[in-house]
Amino acid sequence: RLTEKSVILAGGTDLMPKIRSGKKEPDLYLSLCRMEELKAIDRQGEWLKIGAMAAHTQASEDPFIRKYFTALAMACSQVGSQQIRNKGTLGGSLANASPAGDIIPCIFLYGGKIEILGENGIRSVDAESFLLENGCTLLGRNELITSILLPLEEERKSCFVKLGSRREV
Protein backbone atom coordinates (compact mmCIF):
# COMPACT_ATOMS: atom_id res chain seq x y z
CA ARG A 1 0.00 0.00 0.00
CA LEU A 2 1.24 3.45 -0.92
CA THR A 3 1.68 6.05 1.79
CA GLU A 4 1.46 9.85 1.59
CA LYS A 5 5.21 9.98 0.86
CA SER A 6 5.28 7.14 -1.69
CA VAL A 7 5.88 8.01 -5.35
CA ILE A 8 5.08 6.29 -8.62
CA LEU A 9 8.10 6.38 -10.91
CA ALA A 10 7.54 6.38 -14.66
CA GLY A 11 10.14 8.27 -16.70
CA GLY A 12 11.30 10.26 -13.67
CA THR A 13 12.12 13.41 -15.64
CA ASP A 14 10.04 15.65 -13.34
CA LEU A 15 10.27 13.59 -10.17
CA MET A 16 14.02 12.96 -9.87
CA PRO A 17 15.02 16.66 -9.84
CA LYS A 18 12.49 17.25 -7.02
CA ILE A 19 14.01 14.37 -5.04
CA ARG A 20 17.58 15.57 -5.64
CA SER A 21 16.70 19.08 -4.49
CA GLY A 22 14.96 17.79 -1.35
CA LYS A 23 11.48 18.99 -2.39
CA LYS A 24 10.28 15.37 -2.23
CA GLU A 25 11.46 12.72 0.22
CA PRO A 26 9.76 9.45 -0.77
CA ASP A 27 9.59 6.49 1.58
CA LEU A 28 8.76 4.09 -1.27
CA TYR A 29 9.25 4.09 -5.05
CA LEU A 30 6.80 2.14 -7.20
CA SER A 31 8.51 1.80 -10.58
CA LEU A 32 6.40 1.17 -13.67
CA CYS A 33 9.44 0.81 -15.94
CA ARG A 34 8.97 -2.90 -16.65
CA MET A 35 5.25 -2.73 -17.35
CA GLU A 36 5.49 -3.14 -21.13
CA GLU A 37 1.71 -3.09 -21.63
CA LEU A 38 1.70 0.52 -20.40
CA LYS A 39 4.05 1.47 -23.26
CA ALA A 40 1.77 0.20 -26.04
CA ILE A 41 0.01 2.36 -28.62
CA ASP A 42 -2.95 0.43 -30.06
CA ARG A 43 -6.17 0.99 -31.93
CA GLN A 44 -9.12 -0.32 -29.90
CA GLY A 45 -12.38 0.02 -31.77
CA GLU A 46 -13.23 3.70 -32.08
CA TRP A 47 -10.28 4.79 -29.90
CA LEU A 48 -6.53 5.05 -30.07
CA LYS A 49 -5.17 3.83 -26.74
CA ILE A 50 -1.79 5.29 -25.75
CA GLY A 51 -0.20 3.63 -22.73
CA ALA A 52 0.76 6.04 -19.97
CA MET A 53 4.38 4.82 -20.14
CA ALA A 54 4.72 5.64 -23.86
CA ALA A 55 7.68 8.01 -24.19
CA HIS A 56 7.34 11.29 -26.06
CA THR A 57 9.77 10.08 -28.75
CA GLN A 58 7.75 6.89 -29.22
CA ALA A 59 4.52 8.89 -29.64
CA SER A 60 6.12 11.45 -31.97
CA GLU A 61 7.35 8.66 -34.27
CA ASP A 62 4.23 6.48 -34.22
CA PRO A 63 2.79 6.42 -37.77
CA PHE A 64 -0.82 6.30 -36.56
CA ILE A 65 -0.38 9.28 -34.23
CA ARG A 66 1.46 11.19 -36.97
CA LYS A 67 -1.38 10.61 -39.43
CA TYR A 68 -4.48 11.08 -37.25
CA PHE A 69 -3.21 13.19 -34.32
CA THR A 70 -0.60 15.40 -35.98
CA ALA A 71 -0.61 18.13 -33.33
CA LEU A 72 0.13 15.54 -30.62
CA ALA A 73 3.00 14.04 -32.64
CA MET A 74 4.41 17.52 -33.21
CA ALA A 75 4.07 18.48 -29.53
CA CYS A 76 5.75 15.25 -28.40
CA SER A 77 8.65 15.94 -30.77
CA GLN A 78 9.25 19.32 -29.10
CA VAL A 79 9.03 18.39 -25.39
CA GLY A 80 12.20 19.35 -23.47
CA SER A 81 15.49 17.96 -24.75
CA GLN A 82 16.11 14.70 -26.64
CA GLN A 83 16.91 12.96 -23.33
CA ILE A 84 13.61 14.15 -21.83
CA ARG A 85 11.70 13.00 -24.93
CA ASN A 86 13.32 9.58 -24.72
CA LYS A 87 12.59 9.05 -21.00
CA GLY A 88 9.61 11.28 -20.24
CA THR A 89 6.18 9.69 -20.57
CA LEU A 90 2.83 11.00 -21.72
CA GLY A 91 1.23 9.78 -18.50
CA GLY A 92 3.89 11.57 -16.48
CA SER A 93 3.25 14.80 -18.37
CA LEU A 94 -0.45 14.55 -17.53
CA ALA A 95 0.15 13.59 -13.88
CA ASN A 96 2.55 16.52 -13.49
CA ALA A 97 -0.22 18.86 -14.72
CA SER A 98 2.19 21.66 -15.56
CA PRO A 99 0.64 24.63 -17.38
CA ALA A 100 3.70 24.47 -19.64
CA GLY A 101 2.94 20.84 -20.57
CA ASP A 102 3.14 20.64 -24.36
CA ILE A 103 0.89 17.61 -24.82
CA ILE A 104 -1.97 18.73 -22.57
CA PRO A 105 -3.63 21.13 -25.07
CA CYS A 106 -3.45 18.40 -27.72
CA ILE A 107 -5.23 15.87 -25.51
CA PHE A 108 -7.94 18.52 -24.92
CA LEU A 109 -8.10 19.34 -28.65
CA TYR A 110 -8.88 15.74 -29.55
CA GLY A 111 -11.46 15.21 -26.77
CA GLY A 112 -9.26 12.68 -25.02
CA LYS A 113 -10.04 10.58 -21.98
CA ILE A 114 -7.71 9.44 -19.22
CA GLU A 115 -7.91 5.89 -17.84
CA ILE A 116 -7.05 5.66 -14.16
CA LEU A 117 -6.38 2.47 -12.18
CA GLY A 118 -7.25 2.49 -8.49
CA GLU A 119 -8.37 0.18 -5.72
CA ASN A 120 -11.86 -0.04 -7.26
CA GLY A 121 -10.65 -0.88 -10.78
CA ILE A 122 -10.30 1.31 -13.87
CA ARG A 123 -12.23 4.52 -14.38
CA SER A 124 -12.26 6.83 -17.38
CA VAL A 125 -12.49 10.62 -17.13
CA ASP A 126 -12.55 13.39 -19.71
CA ALA A 127 -9.13 15.00 -20.02
CA GLU A 128 -10.59 18.43 -19.33
CA SER A 129 -12.00 17.29 -15.96
CA PHE A 130 -8.79 15.40 -15.08
CA LEU A 131 -6.77 18.60 -14.71
CA LEU A 132 -8.02 20.75 -11.85
CA GLU A 133 -5.40 23.52 -11.75
CA ASN A 134 -1.64 24.05 -12.00
CA GLY A 135 -0.06 20.86 -10.66
CA CYS A 136 -3.36 19.33 -9.47
CA THR A 137 -5.31 16.46 -11.00
CA LEU A 138 -8.20 14.15 -10.12
CA LEU A 139 -5.72 11.39 -9.26
CA GLY A 140 -6.39 10.07 -5.79
CA ARG A 141 -3.93 8.38 -3.50
CA ASN A 142 -3.27 4.81 -4.68
CA GLU A 143 -4.26 5.70 -8.27
CA LEU A 144 -2.23 5.89 -11.46
CA ILE A 145 -2.81 6.76 -15.08
CA THR A 146 -2.83 3.66 -17.29
CA SER A 147 -3.65 5.18 -20.68
CA ILE A 148 -4.83 8.07 -22.77
CA LEU A 149 -7.76 7.43 -25.11
CA LEU A 150 -8.23 9.53 -28.24
CA PRO A 151 -11.39 9.16 -30.36
CA LEU A 152 -10.72 8.02 -33.90
CA GLU A 153 -12.45 10.14 -36.47
CA GLU A 154 -11.84 10.70 -40.13
CA GLU A 155 -8.44 12.11 -40.86
CA ARG A 156 -8.33 15.71 -39.63
CA LYS A 157 -5.88 18.54 -39.95
CA SER A 158 -4.07 19.89 -36.90
CA CYS A 159 -0.69 21.26 -35.97
CA PHE A 160 1.28 22.36 -32.92
CA VAL A 161 3.35 25.51 -32.63
CA LYS A 162 5.48 26.00 -29.54
CA LEU A 163 5.85 29.60 -28.45
CA GLY A 164 9.09 30.35 -26.66
CA SER A 165 12.67 31.41 -27.12
CA ARG A 166 14.40 28.09 -26.30
CA ARG A 167 14.66 25.16 -28.67
CA GLU A 168 15.62 22.61 -25.99
CA VAL A 169 15.98 22.51 -22.23
Model-derived features: positions:
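C-terminal structural segment of proteins
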Residues: 1-169
